[in-house]
Amino acid sequence: MSDFSVRQSIEAMEEYSVESVAADIIVNANESNYPLPTEIAQKVAAVTAHFPFNRYPPIKAENLSEVIAKELDVDIDCVKIGNGSSELLEKACYVFGGPGKKIAVPWPSFSMYGEYAALADSEEVRYPLTPEGFVDADTVISFCAQHKPSLLIVCNPNNPTGNYNSLAEMEKIIANVDCPVIMDEAYMEFADGKELAPNDMRPMNKLWLVAGSTLSLLGKYSNLMVFRTFSKAYGLAGLRCGYAVGSIALVRQLGKALLPYHVNAFTLMVAKTLYENKELFKERIKTIRAERDKMAAYFAKLGFHVWPTATNFVTFRAEGELMQQLAEAYEQKYHDKLPAQAASGKMLFKYLLENSILVRDFTSHPVLQGCLRISVGLPEENKQILAKVTELCTEAKL
């Protein structure tokens, strides 16, 4: 790059990319494998026939912000819409980060947090999770007191481990740090937590949305922002839509980093239609939870270590005798020598891919070495996945 002037932090980065791999069963990106409910698809189709594609969208996505604010009983100025919650996370790092600033993020967790911090010329500082992937409030509070970050990000439930951390533990953090706190709740709809903040009197028909979530703490803490997405539980990953809810003071600052018309009109229309009919997803979410728990229990029975999960995915790796058997099978088949933990995960990843099943490979991760992460698919897909994992484990033991 000697002929051009490029920011040093940008030049030092690698462009994010994921290899495109064809497979019959795709369970590597925590997407929903379900189509839109028929009723919602029909509503969208009816509007699309006469949709004003020639017009700009609402300049601040007010049409979607309004229905979310009404549902959560907050002022519309407490809500911001983004192209996925990822855009909002990136912009938050611009707003609250910058040269000389630190952004505290969990580790291991969503890898893009560090990318957003770097783009904002901020220093990423990583606070550790427990060995089982949980957030320890006292650890985070001490970490923030020592490092003095200008922004703290907590991923709950955590990706890629899947852990759900209690509302009490999260509130303890929010109440005891001196910086804005982002609660990234991309997977909260899948959590089984039924606890609520003390004296929460919201109507019962809304509790499924806020149960176990820091959304129930809105209004109590001025340093809190909660980020949610339509990509996971609601299956809109292809349209990119998410939202942030928090105090007016914080959300107003976040809005300054968002460009006019930054979310397209079609996405806003579909997301609004979906949000107004989100009750249609309740049974689907229950099914995904049940399938997730069944898969986790099955992997554990086969001899894998499974991380406690409250999401739409399961993260696991082989240990002990099973790890050695899979590692030996990998070396024999591919004539490649890797540490046993990494080799066992790589063997399973390749075996599934050879059977047209694509999962997420974490075998080279410095903390999650040997791990695979499998999104919960349709029930019939999950059966095929379990059958192929069983098949390989049986062959490896022979």
Each model region followed by its residue ranges:
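PLP-dependent aminotransferase class I/II
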Residues: 37, 223-307
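Conserved PLP-binding catalytic core of the aspartate aminotransferase-like
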Residues: 288-289, 293, 299-355, 378
